[in-house]
A protein has these predicted regions:
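Non-catalytic DNA-recognition/assembly elements of restriction-modification systems
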Residues: 1-34, 162, 166-174, 181-206
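Sequence-specific dsDNA recognition surfaces
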Residues: 24-40, 54-84
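Cleft-lining beta-strand/loop regions that shape enzyme active-site pockets
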Residues: 51
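Short, ligand-facing micro-motifs at secondary-structure edges
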Residues: 57-68, 87-111, 127-131, 140-146, ...
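A short glycine-rich beta-alpha junction/loop motif
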Residues: 108-116, 124-127, 147-174
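Short loop segments at secondary-structure junctions
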Residues: 120-124, 137
Length: 206
């Protein structure tokens, strides 16, 4: 998070003077779905994945309680067919403003009415947009938008489209994402070493 601010500044104040555009300009799709008829009773053990707000956490996807629907139900949600690298944003409820990228392995998938799909054009990298949306400053902005409407804790499609997004050069966006990936690899390596040390310790104690 500190690296984001270090490289790009505050994305809300845009104190680095980057080009700024409404999110609707740099995306090919913004939209949310619906809950299939029958609600929870319509969910299945397998089939097409239905992403709900409980699955979307900041920077990570939660697989617990992942719902599935039939092909017939999925066809009724063909306006929200997920694609690889789509950015997810919770737009209603207590988890409003949480955002992550859809994992490829759960596709084919749809979203319900509480989750918004954001599909990026080539000028903005999905991973960069996700990091921007979950930046502390941007989270505060999203919460204030969600709390200002007639319906509490909700962000409309129109409000998502109008969100002002900083647009640094793609090369710089890529550089930042490469840095994040290296950090993630380091974390995995450290955890593996800790696990191995614990196993060794446990075997010595026996």
């Amino acid at each position: 998070k500190a690296r984001f601010v270090e490289m790009f500044g505050n994305p809300v104040l845009n104190d680095r003077g980057w080009k700024q555009v409404p999110l609707g300009v740099v995306t090919t799709k913004i939209g949310s779905g619906a809950t299939p008829k029958g609600g929870k009773g319509a969910y299945q053990e397998s089939g097409v994945t239905l992403i709900r707000s409980m699955n979307v956490h900041n920077g990570r996807f939660e697989y617990k309680e992942l719902a599935h629907i039939s092909d017939e139900q999925a066809r009724k949600l063909d306006n929200v067919v997920m694609e690889e690298k789509d950015v997810l944003l919770n737009i209603t409820g207590a988890s409003v403003a949480r955002s992550c990228i859809v994992p490829t392995e759960i596709l084919p998938a749809r979203v319900n009415q509480h989750v918004c799909i954001i599909r990026c054009k080539e000028c903005i990298i999905p991973e960069f947009l996700n990091k921007l949306l979950i930046d502390d400053n941007y989270q505060k902005l999203l919460w204030s938008i969600a709390g200002s409407g007639a319906t509490r804790e909700a962000i409309t499609k129109q409000q998502v489209e109008k969100l002002q997004i900083i647009l640094p050069p793609v090369k710089l966006q890529n550089k930042y994402i490469e840095f994040c990936n290296q950090i993630d690899k380091s974390k995995v390596a450290v955890q593996k070493a800790l696990d191995e040390a614990q196993l060794l310790f446990d075997s010595l104690m026996q």
